[in-house]
Regions:
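N-terminal nicking endonuclease/strand-transfer module with a His-rich metal-binding environment
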Residues: 1-186
Length: 186
């Protein structure tokens, strides 16, 4: 019988973490962090079963490379306490095989995150002994991408407005234009 476990974390500079370092560790790879010049080499780490980077359609293709993706994230965040990424650890059912894990994760990530403009870096680990503790690490960008492939704001206020009895929500930027068209905040 499958056992459910989900853990959610935030990768932030305030805690002394780096999105580049986290990605290198989870993908058992070697990545140079352009932000601080530190080379993160986890190529000797064992237990990696599968890894994949998922991008929305509007993402620049070079971000398929996790080094480019996470260095772009590090560059876009300016403060010493920046939230760089969200990380989820999900236990995988031992009753499923590797291809079923991949299919399950791919569908979940596409539907829940990538469809909303988020970039996802996924790794499946099955440490020794194999089949004992299969789990996936899902790293997500904190900022989604807009239609032009640029980082959006982390959180954006929506203003509920009314015009002639009709209600509609606008972001702060959209509201400036909507005011000209007669929309008013409620």
């Amino acid at each position: 019988m499958a056992i459910y476990h989900l853990e959610a974390k935030v990768v932030s500079r305030e805690k002394g973490r780096s999105a580049v370092a986290a990605s290198a560790y989870l993908s058992c790879s070697k990545i140079l962090n352009d932000y601080d010049g530190v080379q993160h080499d986890y190529t000797r780490k064992k237990g990696l079963v599968w890894q994949e980077v998922f991008l929305p359609e509007n993402a620049p293709t070079e971000r398929q490379d996790r080094s480019v993706l996470w260095n772009a994230v590090e560059e876009s965040e300016k403060t010493k306490d920046s939230r760089l990424a969200r990380e989820f650890v999900v236990v995988l059912p031992i009753e499923l095989n590797k291809s079923e894990w991949q299919k399950l994760l791919t569908e979940f990530i596409q539907e829940q995150f990538v469809s909303d403009g988020m970039c996802a870096d996924v790794s499946i680990h099955d440490p020794h002994p194999p089949g004992h503790n299969p789990h996936a690490h899902i790293m997500l960008t904190v900022r989604p991408l807009d239609e032009q492939g640029k980082w959006q704001y982390k959180t954006e206020k929506k203003y509920l407005c009314v015009r002639n009895g009709e209600e509609k929500g606008f972001t702060a930027t959209e509201f400036k234009t909507a005011q000209v068209d007669g929309w008013e905040k409620q």
